[in-house]
């Protein structure tokens, strides 16, 4: 009996050790399983992009060989019925339209994010932020209709041209990228430690100087991420641009002339491409 009593602590320790080893192996196995699952999904994501890219290159290579890369990229005329394919007007329209959207949307979005994060009353911020996020869920065709009945007539009646123009597309895209820029930039500003702002105040800086000289630079990476996402939205937008841009495959001489972007051209010529 004495020997058994002495063995109990050893047996309990051994049992706990075995249980711990089993639990450790099970945990490691679970982690490895999770890592394997993540790797599989990562490979699927990367592989999907690679397959799409390869498919586009392989399918488009014969057409590029027949048309000529130079004629395709730098041609100034697009007439699919006459087999004239020059996409330079669409490239320039997409670039200029995106730049216009950045000029309009980035300052407004950034200042709105700074206001909501650093200046606005908390109650007001709780009301405005969901309203801004709600704008991100509005369909593109609704934005396009708004541009068609508000922006286009305003440009036509007060500025110049028919209203359906590069300027209308830029203004509309600037409005559409606001929710993305505001939401991401505000999250980046909220993530800046409060001690940065308090330290600037302690050194004698006022509120505005502390925000623009300390908090905003500290959140610059997140702000740039929001701007990049907004630019991606502007470049890829199609339906709203089709409704307000004027649909002219010409290099615009001014911002009051109609244009056709690359994405709009893809959609409008899809029926012709399907018959090739």
Regions found by a protein language model. Name each.
Residues 31-39, 108-147, 183-184:
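Cytoplasmic-entry segments and transmembrane alpha-helices of multi-pass inner-membrane transporters
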Residues 241-276:
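Interhelical loop and adjacent transmembrane-helix boundary motif
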Residues 102-104, 110-116, 122, 126, ...:
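Membrane-cytosol interface at the C-terminal ends of specific transmembrane alpha-helices
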Residues 53-83, 250-255:
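Short membrane-interfacial helix/loop motifs at transmembrane-helix boundaries
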